[in-house]
Amino acid sequence: MVIKKGFFALSSCTLGLGLILTACGARGKFDQVDDGVIKLATSIQNKDSIAALNTIYKKYKERHPGSYPVQNFQVPGGYSGLRNDIRTRLSAKDGNNFYNIVLNYPDVVSSLATSDMQLILDNVDTKLLSKNFLSFNERIGGVRQKGIYAIPISLSTELMVLNGPVLHYILNSAKKKENGAQMIKRSGSFSTVQKGTMAIDMNDQKTKDLWQKIENAAKANGKTTSTQTSPQPKNAVSSLQLKQAAEGTSTDNSQDAENSDNEIKKTWGEYKEEGNHTLKGYTFKASVFENWNELLDFSTRVANSFPDKIKNQASKKATELQGVFGVDSVSGALFSATFAAGGGDYDKFFFNVKNGRGNFRNLLEKGSSYNNLQKVFNDYKQLISSNGLYINKGGAYSSNFLKFHQLAFSVGSSSGYHFAFAGESAKRLEFGQKAIEYPRDTYEIKAPTNSQNGNGTLLGSFTKSKSNGKEQSGQDEDNQTSETIELYKSSVPSGKEAGKNALAITNQQLISALENAAKDNKTSQPQARSLTASDQVQITQSSDKVIGYITTSNLDIDNNNTFDVGKLNGDKSTSKIIVNATLKTLNKINTLQSEEGIILPHPQKYKSTDPQAVATVQGPSIIGVHANAKENAETQKFINWFINQKETWPENSKGNKNGQNGQMTAAQYFAKSSGYVLPYSETFTKQSEDEHSTTKDAYKILKDVNDGKLVGYSDPSDFRSGKFRDTIVAAFSGAVSSKADFNKFFKGFEQQLGQEYRRG
């Protein structure tokens, strides 16, 4: 068996997508070298997903020892990075370093089809899958022969997370006081009376129920004992409370909500009704979260009602209030809102695929989707002008701020919505103008002592412990083994093994930062521990000087405070070092706990009067790539096993906690490990919400899509749709920064897109 050598860098042409494959020299089908390996390419960064894939590869090798083994190839840059990597390898006719399987969105099939490199999965049994979630194969551009080319294995949707305590402060500040109480605003030596004039429609049952949840969230956030007014641990119970519980009585916990409001006020500032388009005279209903038009209007009113911290603050530090509404996926929000405004009809959307061809003329020739996009944009424009919108840039998800009360609500993927909640004792690293929650799999870098650094090349070291893959909770620490990894300047000395017990630091700015931190007289004394379940930092004496932090979590690398330093042996992700950071431990009242968040579907209509509700359906599919006759057969053999064959899986893994799931297919194991929904027919016909405890909110929405109660939206698949999506996101992000109007936004979008999209 010949193993392919390392991947080589390929330069990409700078031409438009419609010409790249022809101009760069690649047009037409080509065979790959048969190297006896099935290469599966993915850009997934979720560690649970990666661990599940490795377990699946091992299981397949055990069960099919005579078959080609599967190897994982991790491509950086997310789905777009993998998509671009595939196009580049197609353009070079890379028969030595290409893939057999790709986990990505179906537009990759269209890209493969430009060189006839798509692999029809005609030997894969898809009977277990719901036909409703396979039908997108009919909307893939460039494919001549009808069939199954992409199989969805991990579905998610978009969810809205409301920060209950923050919403309570906003609404409680704005609403009319039932007992005639007034808000007193003190200015100088005199007081003026400021009345809240907003109403909460308590005659509407949905609104009444939502307000109750918001009140309960605020009470949980500011929970105190009966004799104390300062926030206490939220699991604390006083002797009086125990006595009242025994007697069947209860205590008035309205003070808890007031404590929460007082604390959140420090971040959000004073509520004010003067000015235009505030909450003055407004009637709040739960329906504001059901459609984009009302949601954006409400968000704008909130921003204008807190001018000192939002409307009048165009520039914000990472530790300050970021706005009212956070959006993780700009394309998802714009596309689903515009699709809903068009009645859930692809013929009225930006682009569609018919007879194997993608058509973008509806938007570019200013048809109905152009008008709908203008309506949606102008709703956003009001919020942008009031500095109330936060959008994800460079991996800085809104959940990073929602969990610290720096946003009121946000929309993001159901697969990651749990990141909106902080841990029991949340820690945050603050550096420069940025702040991040203390990442998982993070360790403290300690300065070397004089005796350690005899030759002057040792920069520092960190110690981590392994728990042999067992869950941390309930495990005997004696079973753990620790290892110390040292960081050296420029190169690793003899006697040390790079990647195993040493790392060479070559970035001069990072070297200087670590050396300067070691010289600093200030000694950092945070608690030394990792936040992951399987790895722990060995606790050291508090006198050890912390000069930085090293993590394998996904970080935005700026080469100023954050640096990529390569991969340690055994790690699936590269290590990153954070320097010049301050570690802060936050009181729970300053964080959003899971019981204080309110989970809702993303807005499913543009306006409440729209006849059709729409839900986003997203997630990667398993896609085959042509190689050669033998590898094509082996590829389909693996995919068929992955989809259909039930196996027994490790009981201590996330996908099979305590063995409770019994036998299941590799696809089921992967979905459960990753927090996705697998669209088998039985998922929606024989299973209940209780069987989807970690994905029940997404499950309910996807079940409604499967049952025809909602129209599912997913991008039509054309090889140009990836660039189209990236371009509209870039143009919108620019409009947020510059506060451009629609005409300027759209003109910039057209210029970046190019003429090739007008050709049909």
From Swiss-Prot:
Keywords: Cell membrane, Lipoprotein, Membrane, Palmitate, Signal. Residues 222-257, 448-472 have a biased composition (Polar residues). It holds the Pfam family Lipoprotein_X. A lipid is attached at C24 (N-palmitoyl cysteine). InterPro entries: Lipoprotein_10_C (IPR004890), Mycoplasma_lipoprotein_cen_dom (IPR004984), P68-like (IPR054825). One of its GO terms (cellular component) is plasma membrane. It is a lipid-anchor. It comes from the Bacteria. It is found in: Cell membrane. Residues 220-262, 443-482 are annotated as: Disordered. Belongs to the MG185/MG260 family. This is Uncharacterized lipoprotein MPN_408. It comes from Mycoplasma pneumoniae (strain ATCC 29342 / M129 / Subtype 1) (Mycoplasmoides pneumoniae).
